[in-house]
A protein has these predicted regions:
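A short, Lys/Arg-enriched amphipathic alpha-helix from helix-turn-helix/homeodomain DNA-binding modules
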Residues: 3-39, 45-48, 65, 69-88
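Terminal helix-turn-helix DNA-binding modules in bacterial transcription factors
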Residues: 38, 42, 61-101, 105, ...
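Recognition helix of helix-turn-helix DNA-binding domains
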Residues: 49-52, 56
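Ser/Thr-centric signal marking residues that sit
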Residues: 54, 63, 115
Length: 132
């Protein structure tokens, strides 16, 4: 039921702009497949055949977000899916590559203005929170 509420939330709030450039899309897919991948953009860009500066520029042009913002948005979407499926916060934090649950909770609170636990207990979970 909670997943239904999250899915019913306005799409733009949970929307992740996907890059059109095939090299950048390949890089984005690597992170979507493994959101815990903490490699820096330099390493990911090189693997996709892009210079770091080109990857930075393309991310901004094609998604409207910087790379770090895009990665955080990706992780927030994965976090909401996992939390709504009942996974414990510590497990979600680990699955998303955070060193500690506290680091994950701090990021979540910056984005949604509340902790994951309070967010999930809210009557309209997912309905009123916008990703910052």
């Amino acid at each position: 039921m909670l997943l239904d509420e999250i899915e019913a939330a306005p799409r733009e709030r949970l929307h992740l702009p996907w890059p059109r450039d095939r090299r950048l899309a390949r890089l984005a897919q690597v992170l979507a497949d493994d959101p815990a991948d903490n490699r820096p953009l330099e390493a990911l860009a090189a693997r996709a055949g892009l210079a770091t500066r080109t990857a930075q520029r393309l991310f901004r042009e094609e998604t409207g977000l910087g790379f770090a913002q895009w990665r955080q948005q990706l992780r927030l979407i994965h976090a909401l899916e996992r939390l709504s499926a009942g996974q414990p916060v510590a497990q979600v934090a680990d699955a998303l590559g955070y060193a500690t649950p506290g680091n994950f909770i701090a990021m979540f609170k910056r984005a949604f203005g509340t902790t994951p636990g309070r967010y999930l207990r809210a009557p309209q979970a997912g309905g009123d929170a916008a990703v910052a």
